[in-house]
Amino acid sequence: PVGKAAELSTPTQKARALGMYMADYNVLKAIGKPTDEVEGVIAKLATDLNVSFVLDILKEQAPKDATKEQLQAFLNAQEDKIIEKMAAENKIDAEVEMLGAASAEYACLVANPTLVVEGDATSAGLSTNMEKRVSMLEEVVADLAAYYPDLKQLGETIAPLKEKVASIQSARAANAEIMGIRDALLK
């Protein structure tokens, strides 16, 4: 819900929310739904965090009539671009918070039967990458937690996602727990 963004006060919460809205934006874009409302929130959060380039990168269009594989490659390249730019701007902690929260949001989307149908471009790409994504984040968090204490909480919060998103079926079975993980990130 976009209204919740106004309640966020700390940079950590804002970075996590930005990651969640970025995930929503990509999924809305992939299924051809309007993105204006989410774009507005992304713009505000990105401005607050001084990373306004995020929206410009997100708005780049995927190739028309892209196959599932091409769309996945495009989204991965886009994420890499955001990561590189944030690293260049020395915002590694915010970037990891964003990626962690985006993973939790993607897990919610995979787990929600009303949002994603199996075989849909988004769910197909998401479920195969989710475990890998959470494992990678765990490694990064372990490396950085000494410098950024908030990351330790992020890592501990999202770690259980790994077994819950092994398949679309397991994600759906764990829907309520996955939603709880996502909600815990914004507390």
Where are these regions (language model features)?
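Secondary-structure edge/capping motif, primarily at the C-terminal ends of alpha-helices
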Residues: 25, 29-32, 49, 56, ...
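Charge-rich, solvent-exposed alpha-helical interaction surfaces
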Residues: 4, 17, 21, 41-45, ...
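Short, charged, amphipathic alpha-helical segments
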Residues: 39-44, 97, 124-131, 154-159, ...
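A cross-kingdom marker for long, charged
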Residues: 146, 150-187
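Long, charged/polar, soluble alpha-helical segments
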Residues: 2-7, 53-63, 67-70, 74, ...
